[in-house]
């Protein structure tokens, strides 16, 4: 099952899910159309991969920011950059990769603030890996 959430600022507006990632996005598009909801100030979060097709679909909806917990394709990233979209991948907890359009991202004002690692989690290339 794939899910999508349409957000305005930090507030979720609607959640849709489907067995297909594209279908979940289509349900969001349909809801926006039926409710007369504008897209310019919205963010779309999806559980699906950030492929070129997902970027094109989101761009056609007029949504400037596309976020996923999943991975991405090089073509999807290139298209997002060409279209002036913000693309964020691998979002889990407070960690994420800004792949395109980082000028829209408001970074934490406290440089000392760091996300807590999940218990037992070790990242590749971490200091602990080098010491082993």
Residue ranges: model-predicted function:
Residues 55, 60-132:
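Conserved catalytic-core subdomain
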Residues 1-49, 53-56:
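Conserved mixed alpha/beta catalytic, RNA-binding, or beta-rich assembly cores of soluble enzyme
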